[in-house]
Swiss-Prot record:
Cell location: Cell membrane; Apical cell membrane; Basal cell membrane
Outcome reported for the amino acid change (mutating R471P): In CDSP; loss of carnitine transport
Region named Disordered: 535-557
Result when mutating R399W: In CDSP; reduces carnitine transport to less than 5% of wild-type activity
Cytoplasmic side: 1-20, 164-172, 219-232, 279-341, 395-406, 452-462
Name listed for the protein in its UniProt record: Organic cation/carnitine transporter 2
Binding site for ATP: G218, T219, E220, I221, L222, G223, K224, S225
Organism: Homo sapiens
Family stated for the protein in its record: Belongs to the major facilitator (TC 2.A.1) superfamily. Organic cation transporter (TC 2.A.1.19) family.
Resulting phenotype, S470F: In CDSP; loss of carnitine transport
Annotated consequence of substituting P46L: In CDSP; carnitine transport reduced to less than 5% of wild-type
Post-translational modification: Glycosylated. Glycosylation affects the expression levels.
Length: 557
């Protein structure tokens, strides 16, 4: 019996057909790059202060002293959420009293912004924060909006695999791409905050679903060697390119509704890819649709200038993997023995911390000194060398030390942030970018490392649980950024400390580099410093299928 790769080996690895599929599927990821982090600009909070009605009878001196001062980052700035009691200062103005000279401003009664806010338009013409006044008592709604987007990502990650298994990779790719683009466009017509948030959740569901569908479609169509490059560099770098495009759009378009219009246009253009991207022949074969799969392979051979055998797929010859009797496993197997339990707990902590660091630093770019658009672009650009470095480390160096080094680098520079003098704000920006570099490299490597730790019988389940933990981390990340409103360095201290602790934790995980993939739970590598403990479940676990000893060198997002 021959498997799919052997049957289609005559196509070659890197012909015109494979190159087309590689670049088109990678290009379909570009909208995901700017959709996922568009909240950096859509939900930005400009400088603001309490509005004073034009009808208020105040002298020019009192109009310049309606807002009290407060300390922020060691300097006095106008308060964003309080003003002096308007009726009181109107009386002082009518009496001809001068602020500071005749009236002690420190003794004046204050009130909230009863007449709304005035928002600076130096950077943004409008955001959803200025649209619906998401400041002061309602400032918690801004991070909630971002968290709910990631809730949509979490929900989408649950259903995307099942949908593509049931309806096909190509169908799910384009339907969810349309879902992401369509609901993003509908956000333009949001009448209130609640409508915007509900649509944002649906955008998040579509965003992760088409990402997963494109990833699976590419890994199933492309050959073994190209598959590695596609999964480690192709989708990641094109995602980063989409992220880099985001600040470019936002620089020229300062209104949030018009920015959304611009961000949905590339998604509309992706519709044309329908006529160039085929369905996965592997999936068609799994559905018994051999003739359709053969048509696709013949077109691929024609594009590559290769003579096609008279018969490509012989149903009796292909391995029917689904016919193999398999022992069922459930999520409790990830906790069955002491060793796999420790690997699972440590993997969950690792993934969650890395996700908090990656998205926390990405969302924090508006709070850095300097130009927000340049900072966002740098945050995106630094991901490209991080992905390349991660790929090289996966090829040649041990996993544990590579992961720990990347995390130590990312965490330590974040802790140094509080030591940077205020006048060296460019150094602070450099440190944040170095931290983002380290965390991004670790994020890219953790997929491979986790997959290598778990045995074949529960590998998919183990990576799935870990990936879910990363989604939970992304949901929490906006609130780490939110803490910066109370202490500028608190987010960096928390993220840096967690990242360093996770780096230390990584050193206790087994080293999988250069070792065959385990097939059964008994074959798993042992957690460092832990003695082997026999449990009754060892005898219950039976070997469940064979997998050729190999080393994983690709990520599976």
């Amino acid at each position: 019996m021959r498997d799919y790769d052997e049957v289609t080996a005559f196509l070659g690895e890197w012909g015109p057909f494979q190159r087309l599929i590689f670049f088109l599927l990678s290009a379909s990821i570009i909208p995901n790059g700017f959709t996922g982090l568009s909240s950096v600009f859509l939900i930005a909070t400009p400088e603001h202060r309490c509005r004073v009605p034009d009808a208020a009878n105040l002298s020019s001196a009192w109009r310049n002293h309606t807002v009290p001062l407060r300390l922020r980052d060691g300097r006095e700035v106008p308060h964003s959420c309080r003003r002096y009691r308007l009726a009181t200062i109107a009386n002082f103005s009518a009496l001809g009293l001068e602020p500071g000279r005749d009236v002690d401003l420190g003794q004046l009664e204050q009130e909230s912004c009863l007449d709304g806010w005035e928002f600076s338009q130096d950077v943004y013409l409008s955001t959803i924060v200025t649209e619906w006044n998401l400041v002061c008592e309602d400032d918690w709604k801004a991070p909630l909006t971002i968290s709910l987007f990631f809730v949509g990502v979490l929900l989408g990650s649950f259903i995307s695999g099942q949908l593509s298994d049931r309806f096909g990779r190509k169908n799910v790719l384009f339907v969810t791409m349309g879902m992401q683009t369509g609901f993003s466009f509908l956000q333009i017509f949001s009448k209130n905050f609640e409508m915007f948030v509900v649509l944002f959740v649906l955008v998040g569901m579509g965003q992760i679903s088409n990402y997963v569908a494109a990833f699976v479609l590419g890994t199933e169509i492309l050959g073994k060697s190209v598959r590695i490059i596609f999964s480690t560099l192709g989708v990641c770098i094109f995602y980063a390119f989409g992220y880099m495009v985001l600040p470019l759009f936002a620089y020229f378009i300062r209104d949030w509704r018009m920015l959304l219009v611009a961000l949905t246009m590339p998604g509309v253009l992706c519709v044309a890819l329908w006529w160039f991207i085929p369905e996965s022949p592997r999936w068609l074969i799994s559905q018994g649709r051999f003739e359709e799969a053969e048509v696709i392979i013949r077109k691929a051979a024609k594009a590559n200038g290769i003579v096609v055998p008279s018969t490509i797929f012989d149903p009796s010859e292909l391995q029917d993997l689904s016919s193999k009797k398999q022992q069922s496993h459930n999520i409790l197997d990830l906790l069955r023995t002491w060793n796999i339990r420790m690997v699972t707990i440590m993997s969950i902590m690792l993934w969650m911390t890395i996700s908090v660091g990656y998205f926390g630093l990405s969302l924090d770019t508006p709070n850095l000194h300097g130009d927000i658009f340049v900072n966002c672009f740098l945050s995106a650009m630094v991901e490209v060398p991080a992905y390349v470095l991660a790929w090289l480390l996966l090829q040649y160096l041990p996993r544990r030390y590579s992961m720990a080094t990347a995390l130590f680098l990312g965490g330590s520079v974040l802790l140094f942030m509080q030591l940077v003098p205020p006048d060296l704000y460019y150094l602070a920006t450099v440190l944040v970018m170095v931290g983002k570099f380290g965390v991004t490299a670790a994020f890219s490597m953790v997929y491979v490392y986790t997959a290598e730790l778990y045995p074949t019988v529960v590998r998919n389940m183990g990576v799935g649980v870990s990936s879910t933990a990363s989604r939970l981390g992304s949901i929490l990340s906006p609130y780490f950024v939110y803490l910066g409103a109370y202490d500028r360095f608190l987010p960096y201290i928390l993220m840096g400390s967690l990242t360093i602790l996770t780096a230390i934790l990584t050193l206790f995980l087994p080293e999988s580099f250069g070792t065959p993939l385990p097939d059964t739970i008994d074959q798993m590598l042992r957690v460092k410093g832990m003695k082997h403990r026999k449990t009754p479940s060892h005898t219950r676990m039976l070997k469940d299928g064979q997998e050729r000893p190999t080393i994983l060198k690709s990520t599976a997002f």
